[in-house]
Structure formats: structure tokens, C-alpha cells
Amino acid sequence: MSFYQKLFASKYDSFMKGIEISFFDLRKELIENLEGKILDVGSGTGVNFEHFHASAEVISIEPSKYMIEKAKAKLPSEKSIKLYNLGINDSELEYMIEDNSLDYVICTLVLCTIPDYELALQKIYKWLKPTGKLIILEHIHAEKKHRKIIQNIINPVWKIVGDGCNLNRNTDEMILKIGFKPDKEEYFKRTLRFYSGIFGK
């Protein structure tokens, strides 16, 4: 498995280059004005770093030791970003983050990879302040039945080569199930179906 993790990390930026160019303005819009205490879930290779406001206090977590090496190279010295080699469901985070303490939690192209993403969203909910917001940019399940069938067939293999990425998750439904309320949400397509938005408690 570590072979695929290492390969995925080494090729991630080049593989995602076209998609990330199309997402640049959306990432910037979602992130650049956020201030206060922020949790960046699954930093990957550090794509979000350039968009963080200089005054924000960012805790950025990434479970892949290969991804985090890429992310370290992108850490801007003028910003307050602390990077940790942790997953969101690791017990260490429970000691680092108090309930009702975060202003924002950012999940961009990461909920597809977290093994227990329902638990992750439950933790995010309890860590956010009553006025806190969840910021989302995720690919989700297909809308049409035949596309869902194809996703379900492909998913087991894709999950291996894609470092745990699931093509077919109902992330939009799970967010609402946890109790989040949308301030803004949008569905759109970039080959896959995507879901972005801002959610309160």
C-alpha cells in the first residue's frame, strides 16, 4: 500500500494541475478572507496554503508522510500555519483541539479519503464554535443511476491507486445528516460531480 501512497504523492500535483487551475478562483473565494482559528483537514501537498489570510491561525493536518513532505516545501514563512502528520480521527487531535474552539474547518478534496468520514464530520461539528463554519469543496457520487453503477464498479480499484479516495461518497447528504445547515451550497461538474459550500451549526 505504501508504494501506491508514495506514487500518488509524487504524481499528485502534476495529475491534478488542470483541475486545480479550474479550482483556483473557487478555492481563493472560499478561503482568502477567513480569519481566526482554522483547521485545514488533509493539507495534501499544501494547495490551500497560498490562500490563507496572513492573520489566520491555521492548524493543517495530513496523514500521509509522503504528502506532508510536499506540503512542507510550500509552507509560507509569513503565515501562521502549523503542519502536523496526523489524520482527523487520530486521538492526538482530541488533546490539541477543544470543543467549540474553531472559527472555520476547511475540507477540500479530502472527505473522499477519510475511512470514517461520518466520525470526522461529527468531530468537526463539536470542534466548531456555535458561530463557526465548515467550508467544503468535494467530489461526490454521480447523479444518474448508470454513472453510479460505473462508480461503484471502479471504486475498489481506484481506492487502492488513489490513496484511499472514494469516487462514490454521499458527502452532501452526510454533511446535512450530521446537523450542518447550508449558508451557501453549489453542485457542479468537472468530469466528476462536485459539491462546494459554507455550512453553519
In which residue ranges do the predicted regions lie?
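A short glycine-rich, Lys/Arg-flanked "PGG" loop and its adjoining helix->strand segment in the class I
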Residues: 118-130
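Class I SAM-dependent methyltransferase SAM/SAH-binding core
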Residues: 39-93
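C-terminal alpha-helical "lid/dimerization" subdomain adjacent to the S-adenosyl-L-methionine
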Residues: 15-19, 137-189, 194-195
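A short acidic, Gly/Pro-enriched loop at the edge of an enzyme's catalytic core
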Residues: 89-105
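Conserved class I S-adenosyl-L-methionine
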Residues: 1-35, 47-48, 67-70, 158
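C-terminal lobe and adjacent flexible extensions of AdoMet/dcAdoMet transferase-like proteins
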Residues: 196-201
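Short glycine-centered segments of the SAM/dcSAM-binding site in methyltransferase folds
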Residues: 57, 131-133
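A short SAM/SAH-binding and catalytic strip from SAM-dependent methyltransferases
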Residues: 103-116
